[in-house]
Each structure stands twice: as structure tokens, then as C-alpha cells.
Amino acid sequence: MANLHDHRITLTVSGPSVLACGAWLKNTICLTQNNQAYISPLVGDLSTIDARSRLDKTVQRMCREYSAQPAVVAHDLHPDFYSTQFAHAFAQQLNIPTLAVQHHHAHIAAVCAEHHLSQPVLGLALDGIGLGIDNTPWGGELLWVDGARFKRLGHLTTLALPGGDRAAQEPWRMAAAALARLNRGYEIVQRFANQPAAETVAVMLASNLNCPQTSSMGRLFDAAAGLLGISSIQTHEAQAAMQLQHLAEQYGPVHALTEGYQITENNNLDFSSLLSALIDCHDEKYDHAYAAALFHATVAAGLAAWVEKSAHQYEATHVVLSGGCFHNALLRHDLTHRLAEKSLPIHSPQQLPPDDSAIALGQAWIALHHNRL
């Protein structure tokens, strides 16, 4: 019987007990027993000592209450996460193996677990950032997922992260990255004159210094918000994206920008032309609400075309949507509607949120399938 505070999901796959240690943000723990998965309440963001202590105590409690002896410990691919370090220490103590699971693979797997999908699926994972198998920050991924295996079919065309993680807190930096990508880097200093680091960021982008490339959809939203002058600095996660969504909802439905996106020869989705259109909309004389609505509609249209193309190419019978960007109801509803018009069967998170709180379930599901290889 599940603890009253834990969430229980019955799986279609069974095996030795798995302990999954989740992600860095919105951490949860998942423990499996036979074909039952038990997901803990939210542990929280692992940057604090309190959250790390809660993780330790949560694992101890769950193993005790469910009389579980894990046979494997699953964790995120990122080596610096506390959850990863805990997983290795716990496994070493019990002399059991660990399994590193790619972040976006786990996002899609969590929905597969919830919807009892045992066949291969086409997965669209959209979020802030998760470490990819190529050691770069992913976040706008089209994946072919078959149990413990996955293949990256395509991704959003990358943008630079000037200053690395700092760019995730400062949307103006992502806007600067968009300007540089569109060969308008010479505008950065004047456009962001109120930012003391503007000149430094312009030099960084021009010289490609401390500017890792990311395929993140969350950072694309930040770039749009920064270009429109809606948000320059964020005080909490996804603040700029939520402001952009709120403006778009105020305006109402619009048609997507004609030729606002391109699917490249190597199956990447490029929104350069959309960003280019937004660059000249920052002035007060432009309707920012309309621009925000145009951004949402064009992103949804591009994603739908991208998914449809790959679904036909790979003969996908199921499409899975997951990742924190799907908290955005406007994007979620528009994309789901467009895909439904194409008669594509869509599966989205229902019992758990689309964000990183479901990562542990996905890790556990993958580990159970890995044991069957």
C-alpha cells in the first residue's frame, strides 16, 4: 500500500526494485516494487541543504515503508547534480549498479509509464535545460523512444548562452544571442544600454567566449521576451515565459507568421525568421501583446509541422509531449489542436506535471526496461 503522501502508478513492466533519484529542480524520488511505482512528494530544488536532507530522508523512508531493497539506482546524466552524487554513494553502499538516464529521455518515458505505452513513441520534449549525451545543454528535442533506448531525431536550432547559466536568469542575454545569430550583434550595446554587462556580452558573442550552444525551448521564450523588452531579468524560473504567455492570452488568437520557421535538411527546427520579425517590435509604438501572440502561434505551427513530418517519416503511432514548457496552456492547447487535426494520437502528462517532478518516474521506467535488454 502506498504512503498517503506518495503517488502510486501501476506499470506495464515489472522487475527488480529500482530507486530513481530524479533531477535538480523540482526533485522527487521514485521507488518501484514489482509493477508498482511510488513517487514521493516534491523534495524541491537541490541547491539548498534542507532539500538535500529531505532527499536523503525520503529515500530512507520509502525503502523502509515499502520494504524495498533496490537492485539498481537511476539518476540524471549530469554528474554535478546532488541527486547524481547521492545515487552513486547509495549504490556504492549497497554494492549495486547505477544507471545514468538522459533528461529528455526521462521526460518522455514518464508519460509512457503513465499511459502504459509499451511500443516505440515519437517524443517532443520542451523545457529549460537538460544535459544531452553530447555534453551540451538540450531543451527542444524530438526523440524516438523505445524503452531503454532513444534516438535524437532533431532539435531546435541552437542559440548561444552568453555567460552560461547566467543567461537563464537574464533574458536580455538570450535576446543578445538572437541578435548575434542574425548578424545584428552590433545592435546589442545600444539596445541594452541599461545593462552594465552589455558591452562584455557583445564581445563574448562575437568571440564565442563562454557561450555554450543550447537547443532549449525555454531559452527561445526568454530570447523573445528580451527582444520585446518584456523581461530583462528573471527572479524566478520561467518568469519571462509566463509574462509572454499572459500578454498573448490578453490579445487572443492570431495566425502564425508565414515562413516564420524552417525545418532544415538535418531535421532541426529553425525559428530565426520569427526572431528576426520580433527584433523590430521592441519599440513602444508596437503592440507587444500581438507580438507575443504571434510568437506563440508561430512556435505551435512550427512544432506541429516538425512533429507531423517526423511522424510520417518514422511511421509513429503515438506522439508524446512532455517538459516544463507544457505548463504553458496556450502553447499546449494550440499545439495539441494542430496535431489532432493531423489525426496524430497525442499523449500528455495527466497524473503528474510535465516538469522535472516526473523525471524520477521516467528514470525508473527506463531502468526497468534496461534490465530486460
Ranges and model annotations:
Residues 1-70, 78-90:
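Active-site-adjacent structural elements in enzyme catalytic cores
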Residues 1-18, 100-123:
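Conserved phosphate-binding catalytic cores of ATP/NTP-utilizing and phosphoryl-transfer enzymes
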Residues 12-32, 121-145:
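Gly/Thr-rich phosphate-binding beta-strand-loop-beta motif of the actin/hexokinase/Hsp70
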Residues 23-53, 57-58, 180-204, 208-317, ...:
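A contiguous, well-structured pocket-lining segment that forms one wall/lid of small-molecule binding clefts
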Residues 67-80, 314-325:
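Short glycine-rich phosphate-binding loop at a beta-alpha junction
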Residues 76, 95-106, 318-322, 329, ...:
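Conserved phosphate-binding/catalytic loops in two-lobed NTP-binding clefts
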Residues 104-126, 131-132, 171-180, 289, ...:
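Glycine-rich phosphate-binding/hydrolytic loop that grips phosphoryl groups
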Residues 152-165, 205-209, 344-350:
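Short beta-alpha connecting loops at secondary-structure transitions
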